[in-house]
């Protein structure tokens, strides 16, 4: 991150320095609303308290872009959320936190076709607003890549990059499987 090895950094330090991680299975945080969570997270990321009104306006704007009901902001974070709602909540967090790099760990896991399209559209919207932001999308399936249209595709086997290329590599992986890369 910015030329530094972040391996030994604590998660909060990574986040404050501009790294965002969307989890495959986001945790529920009972008692903390989406709105309050984002207010605190944005203030922590920027290193100073943020205007509640301005933050709320940004939240509502992004929620609209992500096709989320405004009532969503008052729900407890991830509590009782569907898989698609959890993923959209994470994309909302990514949009609000404005990271330098976003790591999306199997963001497509458990999503139906419609939810996947909304999430991918949200990632693209954040990327359009912040073209300098890097996105590392980790997936086992090509469908997310088809929607995101990444600049580069890398195949990892046993924790090592064994091939790099473009979308043609994703097609080859889908056709031939991981065994072709061992």
What annotation goes with each model-predicted range?
Residues 131-140:
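Conserved H-loop
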Residues 94-95:
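ABC ATPase C-loop
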Residues 21-25, 31-46, 58:
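Q-loop/switch helix immediately C-terminal to the Walker
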Residues 156, 160-182:
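Conserved beta-strand-loop-alpha-helix hinge in the C-terminal portion
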Residues 116-131:
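Helical segment within the ABC ATPase nucleotide-binding domain
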Residues 103-107, 114:
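Walker B catalytic motif
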Residues 90-91:
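Hydrophobic anchor residue at the start of the ABC signature
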Residues 1-14, 78:
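ABC ATPase NBD Q-loop/coupling interface
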């Amino acid at each position: 991150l910015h030329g530094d090895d972040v391996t030994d950094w604590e998660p909060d330090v990574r986040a404050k320095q501009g790294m965002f991680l969307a989890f495959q299975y986001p945790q529920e945080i009972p008692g903390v609303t989406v709105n309050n969570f984002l207010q605190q997270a944005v203030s922590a990321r920027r290193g100073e308290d943020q205007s509640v009104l301005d933050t709320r306006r940004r939240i509502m704007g992004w929620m609209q872009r992500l096709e989320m009901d405004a009532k969503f902001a008052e729900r407890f974070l991830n509590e009782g959320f569907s898989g698609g709602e959890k993923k959209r909540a994470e994309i909302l967090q990514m949009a609000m936190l404005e990271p330098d790099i976003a790591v999306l760990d199997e963001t497509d896991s458990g999503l139906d076709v419609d939810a996947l399209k909304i999430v991918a559209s949200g990632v693209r919207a954040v990327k359009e607003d912040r073209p300098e932001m890097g996105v590392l999308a980790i997936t086992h399936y090509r469908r997310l890549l088809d929607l995101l249209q990444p600049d580069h595709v890398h195949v990892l086997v046993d924790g090592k990059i064994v091939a790099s290329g473009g979308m043609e590599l994703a097609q080859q992986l889908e056709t031939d499987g991981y065994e072709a890369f061992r």
